[in-house]
Curated annotation (Swiss-Prot):
HAMAP family: Formyl_trans (MF_00182). The keyword Transport does not apply. One of its GO terms (cellular component) is cytosol. Attaches a formyl group to the free amino group of methionyl-tRNA(fMet). The formyl group appears to play a dual role in the initiator identity of N-formylmethionyl-tRNA by promoting its recognition by IF2 and preventing the misappropriation of this tRNA by the elongation apparatus. InterPro entries: Fmt, Formyl_trans_C, Formyl_trans_C_sf, Formyl_transf_N, Formyl_transf_N_sf, Formyl_transferase-like_C_sf, GART_AS, Met-tRNA-FMT_C. It catalyses: L-methionyl-tRNA(fMet) + (6R)-10-formyltetrahydrofolate = N-formyl-L-methionyl-tRNA(fMet) + (6S)-5,6,7,8-tetrahydrofolate + H(+). The keyword Repressor does not apply. This is Methionyl-tRNA formyltransferase. (6S)-5,6,7,8-tetrahydrofolate binds at residues 110-113. Keywords: Protein biosynthesis, Transferase. GO terms for molecular function: methionyl-tRNA formyltransferase activity.
């Protein structure tokens, strides 16, 4: 039987690991990122993949730097015939890439060569795409640049968020892997090189990218909000204080004003001018130091002092 080492870290990777086990493959070890401190008490929390592996009694390795010989040699000690990765979070060294009989394959959440990198789901929505997908490909030393084995398209709905699309792609990736592995192990797949000139990139999200730029068209701001929902969440500022913007809707602008201007205060939201004739109605927000709430609740309380004509985003420095 084929010895498989699975490498993955976040929730996205869990259905992929489960699929391997459900299909009866022998997963001899799981490699994931180290536990991380979270919350106010900074208690160490294990990655979701570690939790899943421990449910099945699978040995778990948590290297801090997989490219260090003493760390990747622990993986090689399990004599993998195949390494399967899904959102692992570290680039593998050549010694690992070359070792398995069937190679190293990766489940990547985009239609490669588009959206290489660590945040392809965010960028697919942020860029207003109507479809994305999953690619299973051989791993190479260059990030997400290996030859492709299989691919499946997944439509992006108008109301999809990074959360809903994440779950769709994770499920699609698990199913695609289930269909791909028998063909790979039987030698019935012809790898397809990626077209480098068509490559685009989706690097990890930076904190400053969470800020809403009200000068952008309303459609782009709507895509930004849903691309960052429910993590890491967009924000704007009002009177020097941060407002996290959890959700908003596109609405026709009732009047023209400079971007960021509050155009109207409605029962269910705050309508804000953008760089186009499409305004954004903020329907769910989290003012600094407060809980997440519906805009209607906010407007009945602390937001009752808001006035039409006030500007959002004047102080763009996040505190």
């Amino acid at each position: 039987m084929t010895n498989i080492v699975f490498m993955g870290t976040p929730d996205f990777a869990v259905p992929v690991l489960r699929q391997l086990l459900d299909d009866g493959y022998r997963v001899v070890a799981v490699v994931t990122q180290p536990d991380k401190p979270k919350g106010r008490k900074r208690e160490l929390v294990p990655p979701p993949v570690k939790v899943e592996a421990q449910k099945h009694g699978i040995p778990v390795l948590q290297p801090t730097k997989i490219r260090e010989p003493e760390q990747y040699e622990q993986v090689l000690a399990f004599a993998p015939d195949l390494i399967v990765t899904a959102a692992f979070g570290q680039i593998l060294p050549k010694a690992l890439l070359d070792a398995p009989k069937y190679g190293c394959i990766n489940v990547h959440a985009s239609l490669l060569p588009e959206l290489r990198g660590g945040a392809p789901i965010h960028y697919a929505i942020w860029q207003g795409k109507t479809k994305t997908g999953v690619t299973i490909m051989y791993m190479a030393e260059k990030l997400d640049a290996g030859d492709m084995l299989t691919q499946v398209e997944v439509p992006i709905e108008e109301t999809d968020t990074v959360g809903t699309l994440h779950d769709k792609l994770s499920a699609a990736g698990a199913k695609l892997l289930s269909e791909t592995l028998p063909l790979l192990l039987e030698g019935n797949l012809a790898p397809i090189p990626q077209e480098e000139e068509k490559a685009t990139y989706a690097p990890n999200i930076r904190r400053e990218q969470e800020r809403i730029d009200w000068a952008q068209p309303g459609e782009a701001i709507y895509n930004h909000i849903r691309a960052f929902h429910p993590w890491p969440v967009t924000y704007t500022t009002y009177d020097g204080n941060v407002w996290k913007i959890w959700w908003g809707e596109k609405v026709p602008a009732p009047s023209l004003a400079s971007p960021g201007t509050i155009l109207s205060l409605e029962e269910d939201g705050i309508v804000v001018a953008t760089g186009s004739e499409t305004a954004i109605k903020i329907t769910e927000l989290q003012p600094a130091g407060k809980k997440r709430m519906a805009a209607s609740e906010f407007l009945r309380g602390a937001g009752s002092r808001l006035a039409v004509g006030t500007k959002l985003g004047e102080n763009n420095e996040r505190t």
